[in-house]
Regions:
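Short amphipathic alpha-helical segments, especially helix-boundary/capping motifs
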Residues: 1-4, 15-18, 76-78, 92
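Charged, amphipathic alpha-helical coiled-coil/dimerization segments
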Residues: 35, 39, 57-120
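Short, charged, intrinsically disordered terminal tails
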Residues: 124-128
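N-terminal helix-turn-helix DNA-binding core of bacterial DNA-binding proteins
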Residues: 4-51, 62
Length: 128
């Protein structure tokens, strides 16, 4: 229930800036690695290549990314963030920071560390 509420609020925060969770994840990944191979990006984000292709089509249509054939490997496609993509990322980053502040209001550092530790253990348990 909490996960749904947090997810819905995060989606709303991004939507207010014209974004979405997939858009944020892609732009944020590209922001930290200015360009990357499309296949590597799909792996990094943990999504199937056809799903990423659909999202990239939309982002490219809006001028936020460009795709180019690799100069060294004709089979590989590089994805690059455009200037408009940088600006969109910055707008969404501002919304993400504000969302995180709102989410963590009234929760101390020790409580957040404890929450992180519990969530890490849950993830480890699921991976078994």
């Amino acid at each position: 229930m909490t996960a749904k509420a947090v997810s819905a609020a995060f989606n709303a925060a991004l939507a207010a800036e014209g974004g979405s969770v997939p858009t944020w994840l892609i732009l944020n990944a590209l922001r930290h690695d200015r360009w990357t191979a499309q296949l590597d990006l799909a792996r990094e984000l943990g999504i199937e290549s056809p799903t990423l292709t659909r999202h990239l089509d939309n982002l490219e249509e809006h001028g936020l990314v460009v795709r180019r054939q690799s100069e060294t490997d004709r089979r590989a496609v590089r994805v690059e963030l455009t200037e408009a993509g940088e600006e969109a990322h910055q707008q969404m980053l501002t919304a993400v920071i504000a969302f995180n502040r709102r989410l963590q209001a009234g929760i101390g550092r020790d409580e957040l560390r404890q929450l992180d530790a519990v969530l890490d253990r849950l993830a480890e348990n699921v991976a078994r």
